[in-house]
């Protein structure tokens, strides 16, 4: 399955910024996914969940789950400054340069600790003529990207068994256009943008969260409240026919705004009923609100479609969804190394 069916988590929290980008009629999105919000130097580990074990995360995880675990605040002061570059052998391929810092340590003994990191990253686009032309058209190479990230966590240890984390972050991602079009429908406009390395789309992401983790005599608990806001600013594109996805003339931008609220709670209870097993009980509530004036700007001959007006002037650009869920999972280990998960 493609990336749209793979759920990305950062520290167990879903990241949904890519949902601010419209689907094409082929079921694809022109996005960089949601894996590039954390610099590699701040990743503690990555957990991958595949197959039936990903079912409890919902339909958006049909292709699996990738959980990016970041480094925790430390009880002693530590700091780092990292510089990285990757220079391809071919000068026509985009080079990467990255600089980031991190600072972690106690604010009030072991009871209150913090972690702060910042990141600047730039990967250049491939040369617009890196591939041999087919007829009169050049096949585009990889587009480039510019990243700016800052993120902070304050961790409050209420007692040895309970930790309360407060997190806030801000990120900006912008592309460096290389000439790619949805249906290979390039034009003089797209070729000019590629040759000049223009930025044709950018994402601004804010995230805030409060998470409580507890260790009890009977098991472990996790409860969290989260808010994520994404502004997706893109050059106007064609919305239908062979020109769908092709950047239009004039270099005019439209901004889509996505807001997501999430609340989740989970209990993990070890049991020994005939065999070792872990019972997981959880609940989740999500609300998403999208204002998409770009995708809803197409007029279809002033005809209604399933009760929705075909005229852009007569329909709202705002949509929302709300999802509530309960789940129960039992991880049974009849013999070491073999798990049964009903």
Give the predicted meaning of each segment.
Residues 13-50:
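Short acidic/polar hinge/loop motifs at secondary-structure boundaries
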Residues 36-37, 56, 106:
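A general structural signal for stabilizing positions within well-ordered secondary structure
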Residues 8-11, 33-36, 48, 60-85, ...:
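N-terminal periplasmic accessory domains that precede
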Residues 155-173, 199-342:
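Face-selective signature of the C-terminal outer-membrane beta-barrel domain
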Residues 27-32, 48-49, 82-86, 132-138, ...:
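Extracytoplasmic loops and strand-loop junctions of Gram-negative outer membrane beta-barrel proteins
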Residues 43-45, 64, 70-89, 114-115, ...:
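Transmembrane beta-strand segments of Gram-negative outer membrane beta-barrel proteins
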Residues 5, 15-17, 53-56, 88-90, ...:
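Short beta-strands and strand-coil junctions in structured, solvent-facing domains, enriched
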Residues 74-197:
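Periplasmic-side early beta-strands and strand-to-turn transitions of outer-membrane beta-barrels
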């Amino acid at each position: 399955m493609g990336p749209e069916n793979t759920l990305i988590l950062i520290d167990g929290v879903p990241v949904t910024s890519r949902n601010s980008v419209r689907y094409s009629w082929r079921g694809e999105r022109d996005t960089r996914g949601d894996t590039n919000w954390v610099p590699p130097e701040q990743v503690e580990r990555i957990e991958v969940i595949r197959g039936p074990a990903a079912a409890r995360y919902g339909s958006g995880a049909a292709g699996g789950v990738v959980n990016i675990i970041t480094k925790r605040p430390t009880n002693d002061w530590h700091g780092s400054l990292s510089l990285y570059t990757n220079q391809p052998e071919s000068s026509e391929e985009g080079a990467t340069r990255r600089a980031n810092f991190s600072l972690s340590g106690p604010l009030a003994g072991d009871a209150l600790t913090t972690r702060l990191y910042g990141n600047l990253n730039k990967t250049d686009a491939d040369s617009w003529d890196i591939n041999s032309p087919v007829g009169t058209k050049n096949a585009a190479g990889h587009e480039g990207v510019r990243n700016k990230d800052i993120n902070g966590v304050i961790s409050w240890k209420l007692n040895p068994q309970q930790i309360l984390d407060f997190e806030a972050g801000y990120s900006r991602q912008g592309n460096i256009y290389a000439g790619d079009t949805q249906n290979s429908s390039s034009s003089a406009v797209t070729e000019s943008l590629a040759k000049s390395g223009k930025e044709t789309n950018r994402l601004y992401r804010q995230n805030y969260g409060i998470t409580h983790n507890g260790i009890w005599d009977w098991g472990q608990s996790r409860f969290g409240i989260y808010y994520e806001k994404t502004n997706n600013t893109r050059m106007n594109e064609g919305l239908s026919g062979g020109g769908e996805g092709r950047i239009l003339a004039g270099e005019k931008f439209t901004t889509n705004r996505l807001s997501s609220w999430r609340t989740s709670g989970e209990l993990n209870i070890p049991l020994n009923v005939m065999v070792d097993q872990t019972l997981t009980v959880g609940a989740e509530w999500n609300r998403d609100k999208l204002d998409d004036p770009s995708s809803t700007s197409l007029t279809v001959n002033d005809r209604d479609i399933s009760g929705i007006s075909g005229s852009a002037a007569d329909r709202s650009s705002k949509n929302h969804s709300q999802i509530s869920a309960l789940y129960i999972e039992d991880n049974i280990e009849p013999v070491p190394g073999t798990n049964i998960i009903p």
